[in-house]
């Protein structure tokens, strides 16, 4: 079995919103515009979230992923090859992050998102305090637990979801801010 590819050097920060740090069932919309002067032959995005994420680039769904490992204090990192989703000029990465502090207290991780995009060894973007974030009020809480050992029931209000927030044409309003809780990445597993 081969070791998965990691970035040459890990940059960026874990980002989140202070008002949701102690909220055990929360959603955060995150986005970052960036410019690609030339789309390289291979552009990679590494991403991790506690607890889960859905990833979009230029309005297209790229993937979803990990739940931070609960027992050993580490976080999983997903690798997405994203060249296909990029365009020359302005691009946007958008991530919906869900955090759930398990009822039994197993999830000791702080909520957050970390990501880093690079091409040909050059960093294109990473998660930091320049991103735009908005509480996911369209995912209504509090929600009922399905059962003692299962997750929460779903309750989504599409009227409160910002239209086209995953696309470059979207213009954030005053409900968007910068993440006010950032933590250095350091070594994965030290969260």
What is the role of each PLM region?
Residues 1-20, 92-191:
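An acidic-aromatic loop/edge-strand motif
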Residues 2-3, 31-39, 43:
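Small beta-barrel nucleic-acid-binding modules, principally OB-folds
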Residues 18-28, 66-75:
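Extracellular beta-rich ligand/substrate-recognition surface
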Residues 24-36, 75-82:
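Short beta-strands within extracellular/lumenal beta-sheet-rich domains
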Residues 27, 38, 46-48, 73-75, ...:
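Short solvent-exposed loop/turn micro-motifs enriched in small/polar/acidic residues
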Residues 37, 41-56, 93-95, 165, ...:
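Aromatic-lined ligand-binding clefts that engage carbohydrates, nucleic acids, or primary amines
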Residues 54-110:
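Beta-strand-rich ligand-recognition modules
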